[in-house]
Amino acid sequence: MPINENMVQEIVQEVMAKMQIADAPTGKHGIFKEMNDAIEAAKKSQLIVKKMSMDQREKIITCIRKKIKENAEVMARMGVEETGMGNVGDKILKHHLVADKTPGTEVITTTAWSGDRGLTLIEMGPFGVIGAITPCTNPSETILCNTMGMLAGGNTVVFNPHPAAIKTSIYAINLLNEASLECGGPDNIAVTVEKPTLETSNVMMKHKDIPLIAATGGPGVVTAVLSSGKRGIGAGAGNPPALVDETADVRKAATDIVNGCTFDNNLPCIAEKEIVAVSSIVDELMHYLVTENDCYLASKEEQDKLTEVVLAGGKLNRKCVGRDARTL
């Protein structure tokens, strides 16, 4: 069989990956006891990833997409069972959305301008090892989506997942590294620690080899990241209202609002959290919500009882977040 240059590059890449695995701190597919060891392993993997061609990175990303679809139901069930939040059916859909819609290397383009004064060329380059904090509300989906985009750019990722979703998070990280190895890439493209804590998060954020931090979570986490002194990307809690006025298709609005706000038990920050309706259509909207979308109009007494449970002691009762209505 004739040997071409591409085949030689693939063979060299595979050998380098195996050498890298042998030299890295011990960890099974990205899982380490110490955060510093996890970062060191990701750093060594990133030296390989950044030298990969776009085609080689895309090959790994394609394998990740395939594995996500194959394991969508498993991860959906794990997430619900471990955290008690959300519902399996919607989480399966979210995993398929991650697999189908997460951008890969196709969005990394070169831009050039030419004119009387010369040529300007803009090339995208990797940050290196990116630190990421992920929530229990959307554990595996966030890890998978983050890694695919970051890997496309030539980066590796160190995660500090929410402790309440560590089993699901580890499963996702194992999946990512298995996909990389199967396609000739290195292990430890995504890493974490066995027992994530606030301390491990601080170690990660302060580490000299972490130039960029991405955080998905509550306002406290996002504030900490954006004030860390490093470059940060924060995705915090959302509280989006749905505004319905007299120009709306009220019937369709009712259906769309219910579909959005009930998706995965209202866990996504982009899901509708309240309705603001003008007086001229409010009765019509309520009619469609109740008669065609299985909504229940609670009495004042029922609202007060629910408020006592959900806002126990004036604070959000986290045991109520993402639960089915019948559980509440």
Q: Which ranges hold each PLM region?
A:
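Short, solvent-exposed polar/charged micro-motifs at secondary-structure junctions
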Residues: 99-102, 200-204, 308-311
